[in-house]
Amino acid sequence: MRPFAIALLGSVLIAPLPAEAYVALMAGQQAKPLQGSFNNVPVLHSNQPEEVHGPGILVSTTPGSAIAAETGEPLANAGYTFNGAFGLHVHHKYYPNDRSRMGSGRGRRGELTLATLLINPGSRPVHIRFERGAVRNSFEAPYLANNLMGVKPLGVRPWNTGPGDATAVQMLRGQLDRKLQDEITIPAYSRIVLFSTQLPAKGIANGLLKGKSDGPFQMAVVAAEDPQSDADLFSVLDQGRLAPGRIYLSRLRQIENGTVFSRVAGVALGDTYEASVSHDLEQGALHVPLTSTNRHNFGTGEVQVNALASRMVDSSLNNVGTYGVRFDVTMNLRGAGPHQLVFSHPTANGRSRFTAFRGSIRIETVDGYEDVHVGMKSGESLPLSSLNLRPGQNNPVKVSLVYPADATPGHLLSVVPDQQLAELRRREELLAAAQAAKKIPSKTATVAPAPPPVAVEIEPITMARPMPQVTPPPQWIQPPPALPTIQGMTPAVISPTRMSQSLLERYQQAVQAQQKLMDSLMGR
C-alpha cells in the first residue's frame, strides 16, 4: 500500500484514498459481484487495426488467409460461419499513409470507403432479417471529445456525440436506421454488399447491427479508396491483402501473455450481458462493477468480458472493450427514503484525467423509465437518477446501456443515500481548493525592514532665568508701603525649594525619553 499524503485545509484533514479504493464514493465500503452472464450470440468485431492507413481487408471470416502489408507474410483469417442470430460491430479511423490525402492547406481530404460484405458459400439462398442497428461516420456524427459532459436528459432525438454513441443509442432503443434494409437475401454461391460508408482522413466510422439468418453465411469488412462500384469492393477481398495499420504484429508474444491488450478482430460470443442482484440498503450502500476488467473490478475479482470464438493473430485474446454489448442489470432494493443512483469511473493513477465515457443509459423503475446521456471523465462519480425507495417492499431498478466505442470500460454502479453523495461533493470541493492553493506561486521570503523609531514626544525644559542682582536702595529712601491684600489673598511666593523639585522632575522626564529612544533603536 502506498503511503498517505495528508493535506491540511483550515481545520479539515484531506487524505488520498488507498490504492485499492480508487473510487472515492465507495471509500470504506465494498463492492459485490453481479455474477451475471453473456448470451451466446456470435458477433463479428472489426476494430483491429483501429487506425487504417490504406485499402485492404480488415477482417474476414472466410476460410484461408491474407497477406499482411507490414510483413509480407500470410495471416490466417478469423474463420467462422454464422447461422441464426448474429451481430456486427465495426469501428475504424482513417489515417492515410499517402500524406496528400490528409487535405493539408486548402486541399480536399481523401476518403476511405468501409464496406461489410456478406458471403453465401452454399447452394441455397440465405434470407436475413435485421432487428436493430445503425451506421454513422464523422460527417453524420461529429466527435468532440469534451462535448456534452455531465448527465443530460435524452429526448426523442438523441444527442449527437460521435459515431460510437450515435449507433449505440439506436441499439439501446431497439431502432433500425432508415438507411439500412430490414431484410436482405444472399443468392447461392454469391456475395453482396450489406452497407458501405465513407469517412474522411482523420475521420471515424462505426456500425452496429443485430439480425437473424435462416441459413449459413460468412462476413468480411474491407476498406477501399475511391471505389466506383461494388465490384471494386469485391476486388479488395479477392486480392487477399490486409489493410496497412496492424501495429500489434510486432507484439504478438505480449498479446499472448496478457501484457498488451490490442483490439478485436474476430468473432465474440455474446451480444448481451444480464445480471440481477438483491440488496438491503439498511445494511449499507450498494456498489457493483459494470463492464469490469482484469484491472478494474473493484475488489470483486469479477471480469465482465466475453470470449472469442475466432480471431486474427494480432487481435486481443477476448472482447476486452465489450463495444456494442448490451448490459442489463436489475437491482432489487429494500430500503426507505431518498437515494442516488450513481455511475463512476476510477481515478487514473499516474496520468491526467481523460474522457472515459460518452453514451446513453436507460433507467427503469416502477414509476417508468428515463434515458440520459452521460459524458464522464476518469475519476468522476455522476448521479444518474434520484430514487425514492418505498419502505417494506421491493424497489426494482433496471439499468441498461449498449457500451459505446471510444469509451474505457471498468465502471462502478452504486446506490447510496443522498447524504453520502453530498459528503463526497464536499470533500471534492475541499480537495479542489487545496490543490488550487498549492498552484499559487510562493513569493520569495524577504526580511522585513526594522520598524521606524518610535516617535517620543519630549517636553521642552524651561530653564529658570537667573534672578537679577538687586542693588539695595540707599538708606535715606523710605521703603514702599506694603501692598494691600486683594479679597483676603496673600501675594504669591515661589519658594526656592519648590522650584528645584520641579526642575528635577523635568530632568527625569528628559532622561526617560532618551532611554525610550535608545531602546527602540536597539530593537528591544
Question: Where do the model's predicted regions map?
Answer:
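Low-complexity, serine/threonine/proline-enriched polar segments
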Residues: G150-D177
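Long compositionally biased, domain-poor regions of proteins
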Residues: Y22-A31, T61-E131, R136, Y143-L144, ...
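Positively charged n-region of N-terminal signal peptides that target proteins for export
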Residues: M1-F4
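Bacterial N-terminal signal peptides
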Residues: A7-P16
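Acidic, proline-/serine-/threonine-rich low-complexity intrinsically disordered repeat tracts
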Residues: A432-G488, A492
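Activation corresponds to long, low-complexity, non-globular regions
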Residues: L25-H53, V222-L290, E429-L430, Q478-P480, ...
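Sec/Tat signal peptide C-region and signal peptidase I cleavage site
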Residues: L17-A21
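Signal peptide-directed secreted proteins
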Residues: L176-G266, L317, I440, A445-E459, ...
